[in-house]
């Protein structure tokens, strides 16, 4: 701060020209001075520009084909789900854009009278097949706030557990408490099949974690102004609330819906009992493909209430991943697992190679475990544990080679010393 005695010359702000007596503080730099008022003004300008740059620019709203191509670079397979999501997300934000611009007179005014309803999305499919990744990738592309909520932790208001408003708090926190930005975000509610009621008939007793949660979610799914406690937890009469309008929040709800395939098969005429029964194992790809024939009545029989189903007009599914898809997941996406582990080893100045039959063995192990793509990382950790323990302490290793035997027989990977690697660098088996 630059202040001088009363007898000296008055210093002035180099930006607004006010003297030191007209402002609270004057901060000195090399040959320049700035007052506290100019600093506040600069902060306001910077914050305004940052908020504008972080908002989704409606003029640059990506087309469905562009959204699909972006999803394709991160998610392997699931073409139908990617196409459905691309169209649904494009239409949703086009609707937000139309709602944000007021209608004019004449023909434009008549068009503005047509109110576009929100289309939330229900995503069905087995675990580890890309449901959460699809939602995360969409939010990353559109640069909108994104929150993931677990439906199993939710209970009806007044009971032990989380209120549904806590879902909205996660979205507000993802937007750095910028409510306006949060109001155009995406919320993914996982494990929604776990809040199904026990039968298709209405319950005569309180079902606080099932049907009660579905009832509590109805309003925020449809669009309402919700009161959210800023610190989470239960609502108290004397605390202040954050008001958020969920009209333009896109909800994607997902779940494995185990057993729903049998309900669909019984409706479309496929036998699930008897000598001619169509039997599916837990990891049979056909068991999830039947989700393509789903109807709202199947979800009703599963235990979802009609009002909840009605607020999820877009229904799509992901299918089980086969061997080829799992190998592609290991190698093709931008953040593929093989690339991640190669990078980890590069940080220790070591090359990591997987033979093609090693990748096939890893994919086969993931199918046997029945955990989909999530099982790939666990298998990779098991396979590479011993070398990840030794390599940081050794400077003589140039390359690590993982073969089929390493995956299936739990032998140690091949370590190639630096002097040997430099002599025969070009001669190696085809590897990833």
Swiss-Prot record:
GO terms for biological process: cell division; proteolysis involved in protein catabolic process. Gene3D superfamilies: 1.10.8.60, ClpX chaperone, C4-type zinc finger domain (6.20.220.10), P-loop containing nucleotide triphosphate hydrolases (3.40.50.300). ATP binds at residues 126-133. PROSITE patterns: CLPX_ZB. The gene is clpX. HAMAP family: ClpX (MF_00175). Keywords: ATP-binding, Chaperone, Metal-binding, Nucleotide-binding, Zinc. Component of the ClpX-ClpP complex. Forms a hexameric ring that, in the presence of ATP, binds to fourteen ClpP subunits assembled into a disk-like structure with a central cavity, resembling the structure of eukaryotic proteasomes. The lineage of its organism: Bacteria, Bacillati, Actinomycetota, Actinomycetes, Frankiales. This is ATP-dependent Clp protease ATP-binding subunit ClpX. GO terms for cellular component: HslUV protease complex.
């Amino acid at each position: 701060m630059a202040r001088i005695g009363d007898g000296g010359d008055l210093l002035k702000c180099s930006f607004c020209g006010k003297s030191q007596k007209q402002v609270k503080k004057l901060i000195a730099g090399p040959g320049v001075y700035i007052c506290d008022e100019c600093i506040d003004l600069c902060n306001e300008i910077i914050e305004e520009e940052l908020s504008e740059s972080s908002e989704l620019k409606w003029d640059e709203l990506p087309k469905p084909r562009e959204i699909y191509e972006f999803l394709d670079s991160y998610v392997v397979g699931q073409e139908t789900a990617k196409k459905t999501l691309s169209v649904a997300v494009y239409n949703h934000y086009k609707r937000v854009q139309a709602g944000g611009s007021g209608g004019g007179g004449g023909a434009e005014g008549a068009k503005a009278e047509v109110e576009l309803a929100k289309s939330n999305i229900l995503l069905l499919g087995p675990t580890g097949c890309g449901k959460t990744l699809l939602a995360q990738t969409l939010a990353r592309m559109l640069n909108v706030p994104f929150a993931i909520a677990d439906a199993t932790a939710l209970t009806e208001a007044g009971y032990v557990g989380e209120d549904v408003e806590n879902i909205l708090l996660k979205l507000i926190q993802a937007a750095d408490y910028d409510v306006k930005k949060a109001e155009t975000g995406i919320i993914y509610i996982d494990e929604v099949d776990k809040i199904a009621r026990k039968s298709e008939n209405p319950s005569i007793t309180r079902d606080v974690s099932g049907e009660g949660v579905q009832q509590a979610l109805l309003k925020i799914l449809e669009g309402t102004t919700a009161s959210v406690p800023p610190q989470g937890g239960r609502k108290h009469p004397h605390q202040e609330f954050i008001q958020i309008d969920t009209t333009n929040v896109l909800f994607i709800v997902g779940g494995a819906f185990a057993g729903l395939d049998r309900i669909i098969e019984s409706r479309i005429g496929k036998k699930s009992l008897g000598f001619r029964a169509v039997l599916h194992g837990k990891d049979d790809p056909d068991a999830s493909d039947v989700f393509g024939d789903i109807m709202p009545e199947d979800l009703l029989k599963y235990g979802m209430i009609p009002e909840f189903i009605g607020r999820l007009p877009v229904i799509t599914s992901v299918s089980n991943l086969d061997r080829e898809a799992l190998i592609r997941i290991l190698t093709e996406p931008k953040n593929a697992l093989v690339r991640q582990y190669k990078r980890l080893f590069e940080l220790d100045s070591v090359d990591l190679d997987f033979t093609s039959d090693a990748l096939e063995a890893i994919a086969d192990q993931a199918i046997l475990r029945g955990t989909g793509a999530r099982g790939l990382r666990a298998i990779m950790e098991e396979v590479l544990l011993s070398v990840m323990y030794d390599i940081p302490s050794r400077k003589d290793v140039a390359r690590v080679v993982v073969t089929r035997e390493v995956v299936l027989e739990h032998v140690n990977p091949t370590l190639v010393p630096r002097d040997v690697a430099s002599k025969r660098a070009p001669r190696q088996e085809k590897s990833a």
